[in-house]
Amino acid sequence: MSDQSKQKELLWQSRFSEPFDREALQFSSSVHVDGLLYREDIQGSIAHATMLGEEGIISAGESEQIVEGLKAVEKEIESGELVPVWEDEDIHTVIENRLKELIGPAAGKLHSGRSRNDQVATDTRLYLRRNIDRLVGLLEAMQSTLLDKAERYKSTIMFGYTHLQRAQPMSAGHYYMAWHSMFGRDAERLADLRKRANISPLGAAAFAGSTLPLNPARSAELLEFDGVFANSIDAVSDRDLVIEFVSACSMIMMHLSRFSEDVILWTSAEFNYLSISDAFATGSSIMPQKKNADIAELVRGKTGRVYGNLMNLLTIMKGLPLSYNRDMQEDKPPLFDTAETTASSLSVFRRMIEKTWLNEERLAKLTAEDLSLATEIAEYLVKKQIPFRDAHRITGKIVAYAIEKSKTLPTISLDEYRTFSESFDEGIYDDLKPDASVNSKKTAGSCSFKSVEEQIARARKNS
């Protein structure tokens, strides 16, 4: 007997006179990927079967039989008793075929009024909803860790940077609160997407709806969707929600990647601002002294994967005519990979950050000796009614003088300061202390200790 004759009959096979080519079947099979959707597929099928029974499209007994059978199939998949193979074409076929083996002819009524198109669209939205909630939870955990770090280091002074050059002193707590804000917007983006994703496509069928007296609103209610599709073509033929999800994840990964860059730099011997627990570092196979921030490096590297997934999806969808096209099957690998990569990156990165600490003695020494207080000199002169551009020019000359004479700004004498401007008096030295500089900031959301405390309190109240 040939391989072709041994092949399982496919759900759509009856119209064709020849069996589907085996290599073509293996090429088009997606069960090795969409197997991840088995929970969502069974969840959607239970809702559909329940609605069919309630509307009298199938009998109440058949509906109950299908629902119980689907629950049994789910248990078999979870226990490993039912293992999909590529000949099954996709996870939906696996479930339906096994259901037929368990309950007999009633299984054939499950697909009444439903197409694979609205079935897959429903599964995808359920998957998006679950993973949105998962990622929002991880982002909130990250924010909680960052709040704890901000609280711990709110009175620690360190450099803020622009162009990777020391710029001005700031509260280290202010740094952590910046990340808190960024991850907060990431969570907001996902929460906003959830509203659009939480609409049921069930009832759209292939793309035109169904002649059967379906009740899409009831299916939506059973699946805890907020509403029903407005247009049946749109319900099955777009993947903008998948693209939006991967885009939102790309933003999360971008933030994690930037944060990783700081961790990598700050844990280097050249910076030595930050120490990381041995539990989240690796060594070298040849250099015994090495302690590498590999988790941060991997997160930074995995960001490229998620960016690639976004471009993958945009490219898949860019030329497709309405409504459904088989190309859309290829949305699953980038979607699933993005969800898992982003979730695992958030989880391990948060735990790593939890086990880091700032080297406060080094930060205090460096900020006291640095030229990063130059802006304070310029603003001191502005308070003396000198136009800012003139104050900036004068301060630039003072900085050049300090570099030439190997002095720090606080060690320049008053007589020396007065050679640059008669406006200087003893008060300049009050401004040339890192803590005074930080706490002199008056604008809302600034880096002063008081402002950081307010940011922390507001964030804790809203969390």
Swiss-Prot record:
It holds the Pfam family Lyase_1. The keyword Lyase applies. It comes from the Bacteria. Transmembrane segments: none annotated. InterPro entries: Arg_succ_lyase_C, Argininosuccinate_lyase, Fumarase/histidase_N, Fumarate_lyase_CS, Fumarate_lyase_fam, Fumarate_lyase_N, L-Aspartase-like. Its EC number is 4.3.2.1. This is Argininosuccinate lyase.
